[in-house]
UniProtKB/Swiss-Prot annotation:
Subcellular locations according to the entry: Nucleus inner membrane; Nucleus outer membrane; Nucleus envelope; Cytoplasmic vesicle
Family as reported in the entry's similarity comment: Belongs to the ERG2 family.
Site (Important for ligand binding): 126, 172
Keyword Endoplasmic reticulum on entry: yes
Organism: Trichosurus vulpecula
Cellular component terms per the entry's GO annotation: anchoring junction; cytoplasmic vesicle; endoplasmic reticulum membrane; growth cone; lipid droplet; membrane; nuclear inner membrane; nuclear outer membrane
Annotated region described as Targeting to endoplasmic reticulum-associated lipid droplets, given as residue ranges: 2-8
Lineage: superkingdom: Eukaryota
Protein name: Sigma non-opioid intracellular receptor 1
């Protein structure tokens, strides 16, 4: 019995060591990355259009992002609004840019929704265009509410309760280990709604973003 218990603890120690090394390797990798976008840049652009009709704001934002970052924003024919079910909430997103370490997307809900934010190996920031964003941070007993023009920052490893009012729309920027965020983003789609067409749309959008980044890297922004 003692031998079995010792072996079990050895495996646990080995597992925790591997996880610690992996986490350290990931953060070292992120430290070497050259990023296309900056959090404050996205927030500042979004604030310019806060309070406008969200469709008008989004169209102007896309034009400006393409001007500032040619070759890094998906073309109109590849932009698609896709449902997202995760953490008990439901919204919709339109992916503009995606790589292994960054993404930019439009997000929101026409009806309102609430649930768990998820924990990520990434920092995620949302700048509100319209509506309200309620956030209840872990370890606190009071929630905060954010309005158009304000930015909500969700740090790596953090978890919150989130609630969006009807017709809440925002611009979201994520930086970190982006593939790791897909596990949460797709969890309810796979295990609850079983909406596999939405699963396909989501993976296709991410694949398109990766393809665009690879093409721009290999052949330049005019390819």
């Amino acid at each position: 019995m003692q031998w079995a218990a010792g072996r079990r603890w050895a495996w646990i120690t080995l597992f925790l060591t591997i996880v610690a090394v992996l986490i350290q390797a990931v953060w070292l990798w992120l430290g070497t990355q050259s990023f296309v976008f900056q959090r404050e840049e996205i927030a500042q652009l979004a604030r310019q259009y806060a309070g406008l009709d969200h469709e008008l704001a989004f169209s102007r934002l896309i034009v400006e992002l393409r001007r500032l970052h040619p070759g890094h924003v998906l073309p109109d024919e590849e932009l698609q609004w896709v449902f997202v079910n995760a953490g008990g909430w439901m919204g919709a997103m339109c992916l503009l840019h995606a790589s292994l370490s960054e993404y930019v997307l439009l997000f929101g809900t026409a009806l309102g929704s609430h649930g768990h934010s998820g924990r990520y190996w990434a920092e995620i920031s949302d700048t509100i265009i319209s509506g309200t964003f309620h956030q209840w941070r872990e370890g606190t007993t009071k929630s905060e509410v954010y309005y158009p023009g304000e930015t909500v920052v969700h740090g790596p490893g953090e978890a919150t309760a989130v609630e969006w009012g009807p017709n809440t729309w925002m611009v979201e920027y994520g930086r970190g280990v982006i593939p790791s965020t897909l596990a949460f983003a797709l969890s309810d789609t796979i295990f609850s709604t079983q909406d596999f067409l939405t699963l396909f749309y989501t993976l296709r959008a991410y694949a398109r973003g990766l393809r665009l980044e690879l093409t721009t890297y290999l052949f330049g922004q005019d390819s």
